Amino acid sequence: MDPCSVGVQLRTTHDCHKTFYTRHTGFKTLKELSSNDMLLLQLRTGMTLSGNNTICLHHVKIYIDRFEDLQKSCCDPFNIHKKLAKKNLHVIDLDDATFLSAKFGRQLVPGWKLCPKCTQIINGSVDVDSDDRQRRKPDSDGRTAKALRSLQFTNPGKQTEFAPEGGKREKRKLTKATSAASDRQIIPAKSKVYDSQGLLIFSGMDLCDCLDEDCLGCFYACPTCGSTKCGAECRCDRKWLYEQIEIEGGEIIHNKHAGKAYGLLSPCHPYDILQK
């Protein structure tokens, strides 16, 4: 079965028609979606599509029906977290996303989640009462109409060169060796651990770098491959993997699949990879 338009533009065609969240396979055209669902799809993917473009039933679940449930950590809009914050989260709704994006000048997506610390920062910075905030929320019909008018398809050119617009969600800042070494144990190797699509060679699993097997991507889009499952470095053809990570609260998450990779790995210091 051919991939859907959403999968093609996001370069996630390998995910099209998966039956992990739905038993059915097939397509919907975007004009079959409600105006609210079309708006959410646009904001959550950063894409522009026409009503004749298609979305497979798997991507409907991922970006519309179950998007909120699949957000497992704080979106960290202020880049303050050294570790993933996964406790006491609350969802950013459509009106809040619109209001806060305008207020802070950065894209906040409906369905993302905030931890108590980021919520306190927002509450401390947004010095308006509820009535004022309500008046400043855009008119729902007007916002939807404006967004739908922008759903015009633009050929992005060669699909392998597709990248989200620069003004969209920034890549999570996990590249500093000092912060990476403090909460992530790394196993390096001389040979590749991941294939050219970012899948583990020894198992074929599309494992997120947060090590949650059910996670469908919780990092900012990788500038190299576009995946939201790549942490500090793109997984495509990567020669190392995370053995464990530490999240806020001191909880350690171990990579259950690390043992299977030992046959591919050569002995060396766990942090040698950070000296590159």
UniProtKB/Swiss-Prot annotation:
Recorded coiled-coil stretches: none
Record bears the keyword Membrane:
no
Extract the ranges annotated as region (Disordered): 158-177
Q: One GO CC annotation, please?
A: cytosol
The source's domain of life comes to Eukaryota
- Give all Phosphoserine modified positions: S182, S266
UniProt keyword terms in alphabetical order: Cytoplasm, Isopeptide bond, Phosphoprotein, Ubl conjugation
For the cross-link Glycyl lysine isopeptide (Lys-Gly) (interchain with G-Cter in SUMO2), the position is K176
Q: Where in the cell is it found?
A: Cytoplasm
User: How does this polypeptide assemble, per the annotation?
Assistant: Interacts with ARL14 and MYO1E.
Q: What function does this protein fulfil?
A: Through its interaction with ARL14 and MYO1E, may connect MHC class II-containing cytoplasmic vesicles to the actin network and hence controls the movement of these vesicles along the actin cytoskeleton in dendritic cells.
Can you name this protein?
ARL14 effector protein
From which source organism is this entry?
A: Mus musculus
Q: Which gene encodes it?
A: Arl14ep
